[in-house]
Regions:
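A short, amphipathic beta-strand motif
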Residues: 24-30, 63, 124
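Short, acidic Ser/Thr/Gly-rich low-complexity loop/linker segments typical of extracellular
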Residues: 38, 44, 54-68
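A short, solvent-exposed loop/turn motif at the edges and junctions
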Residues: 52, 74-110
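Extended active-site neighborhood of metal-dependent phosphoesterases/phosphodiesterases
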Residues: 94-103, 108-114, 181-274, 291-308, ...
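Aromatic sugar-binding surface patches on proteins
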Residues: 196, 443-486
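Binuclear metal-dependent phosphoesterase catalytic core
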Residues: 327-417, 421-424, 486-490, 496-513, ...
Length: 520
């Protein structure tokens, strides 16, 4: 252990990270009576992983561990498969100890009070639980609530329909709030009603804006959720939460993976068997993230990997190869999840006063169920308050003159489509399915909604219509989950059914239909 700690001192110094001054010690144990204290009749657990945020060590045969710790570190146990950790009233894992002897900088939202000297022993309780290899999870991106009104949008639009769902746990991919960490408490209380453990990633709108620099900006997030980079295991899946939002002293932020977080990933992966699925989740997509090459180099030896991000308020699938540092088999699948807040809660309000919030790529606001079966996974995107099979929009005029029928474009926005999707079209009761051509285009309905902006600038009774009816939509973004094609040349006058099906290698297959009228 002396050599290991000395090596850690040298490495942290080379990285420009704070040097360590103390050694923390503790125990991981089976808490038989659920009192979160180690009692004489309870036993320590061997081989459980504990971390200080950079180094990961297993407990010894008696469940004991020791790690170097600085004066601004968080120590945590990595939940192993088949065990659970304590939760607080908001169902947030309580598997960590914050070591901040003098406390955090004072911030407007909740600060971290001085923790004082290290305890003699920092003990982490665990509890056994069954974890079948087949399980479901739910991933939220960017709930991004501005004020309690938008917290209520999250509740009405997403949380209420998830209560009682058969899921193992949930994840928020950052931007939990919109620049107001004081809202963590009400939004956590709401999400807790879903009834499952909930893990959280740090987003660029989850920071404390009243302090400068990277570490101080994380104050209320860490007070509320614990470490922003961490890991846990469930069944045959190793999950890694990665904080890739770095706040600068002069203001603003970068999307970059810190050296210390790369150290953590490297150290943790040394303990992960190669037959496991490794899933990373984070806020900013890896395509726009500094040091992604180093991260993917660490992941490349693992045959089963997958990652999820939010941030863009668009839905995308990327397959990252050598250009991003990936040297493994096939390419790394990186999924950019659609957001609960959609287009930042913009758009006309519906009959319940909730904005439609369609994203700028035409995907409705929503969240994803990600189902796991051993090392396999599938993604089921769910539009908020819409049927589960609402998976595409088919754009075509309803009334088409017969001479124009064969040249009238059918445009399909497949919400969860990717370059590996197969999208096909058929008409009426014909048995033949014709492939559609993938294209990059803007969503026609998004464009129409954007063109309402001048009307929303008008005032009625002294109030802008935008404040009364809903916020204006941005100009739509061009997206690649669009497909196009044309009707057959032999359509006759009358009503016809257009059928479109999406064969998805990463999720269930879906079919939808539209009716058109062809007239002489």
């Amino acid at each position: 252990m002396t050599r290991l700690i000395t090596g850690t001192f040298l490495l942290l110094g080379l990285l420009g990270l704070p040097s360590v001054a103390e050694t923390a010690k503790g125990l991981v144990f089976h808490d038989l009576n659920d009192n979160r204290r180690f009692d004489p009749d309870e036993k320590g657990l061997a081989g459980i992983l504990v971390s200080n945020g950079t180094e990961v060590v297993p407990t010894d045969g008696e469940g004991k561990w020791s790690l170097p710790v600085g004066d601004d570190d968080i120590l945590f146990v990595i939940k192993p498969s088949g065990w659970r950790v304590p939760l607080n009233d908001h169902r947030i894992p309580q598997n960590y100890y914050i070591h901040r002897p003098t406390g955090s900088p004072k911030v407007e939202a909740e600060s971290i009070e001085p923790t004082g000297s290290l305890p003699e022993s920092i003990d982490f309780p665990l509890y056994p639980q069954e974890e079948p290899e087949t399980f479901s999870t739910v991933f939220f991106a960017d709930t991004q609530a501005r004020g309690i009104r938008e917290v209520n949008f999250v509740i009405r639009d997403a949380v209420e329909e998830l209560i009682g769902s058969d899921i193992a746990f949930g994840v928020s991919l950052g931007d939990i709030v919109a620049d107001d960490p004081a809202l963590f408490d009400p939004i956590n209380a709401a999400i807790a009603q879903i009834g499952v453990p909930w893990y959280n990633a740090f987003g660029n709108h989850d920071n404390n804006k009243d302090v400068a620099g990277d570490r101080p900006s994380h104050t209320t997030f860490e007070k509320t959720y614990g470490p922003s980079t961490y890991a846990f295991e469930y069944a045959k899946v190793a999950f890694i939460a990665l904080d890739n939002i770095v706040f600068k002293e002069e203001g603003g932020h970068d999307t970059r993976i810190r050296d210390r977080d790369l150290l953590f990933v490297k150290s943790y992966l040394q303990h992960v068997p190669k037959d496991r699925l490794v899933v990373l989740f984070m806020h900013a997509p890896l395509r726009s993230c500094g040091q992604v090459e180093k991260l993917l180099d660490l992941l490349s030896p693992f045959p089963h990997t997958f990652s999820v991000a939010g941030h863009w308020h668009r839905q995308n699938h990327f397959f990252l190869g050598e250009d991003f540092g990936w040297t493994g088999k096939d390419k790394h699948h990186h999924f950019v999840n659609g957001t609960v807040s959609g287009s930042w809660w913009c758009g006309l309000q519906d009959e319940l006063g909730i904005p439609h919030a369609v994203m700028n790529d035409g995907v409705p606001n929503g969240y994803s169920f990600i189902d796991f079966d051993g090392v396999d996974y599938q993604i089921r995107y769910k539009a908020c308050r819409r049927p589960a099979d609402y998976q595409m929009n088919i754009y075509v005029p309803m009334d088409i003159p017969l001479p124009e029928a064969a040249t009238t474009e059918v445009l399909v926005n497949v919400f969860n489509g990717s370059e590996r999707s197969k999208v096909e079209i058929s008409f009426d009761d014909r048995c033949d399915w014709t492939p559609l051509e993938q294209t990059r285009d803007i969503d026609p309905e998004c464009l129409r909604m954007h063109e309402l902006s001048p009307y929303l600038d008008q005032e009625v009774l002294g109030a802008p219509l935008e404040d009364v009816l809903g916020w204006k939509m941005d100009f739509p973004s061009r997206t690649g989950h669009m497909w196009k094609g044309f009707p057959p040349k032999d359509l006759t006058p009358g009503s016809h059914i257009i059928r479109v099906r999406h064969i998805d290698p990463f999720g269930p297959d879906y079919e939808d239909q539209r009716i058109i009228r062809v007239h002489p």
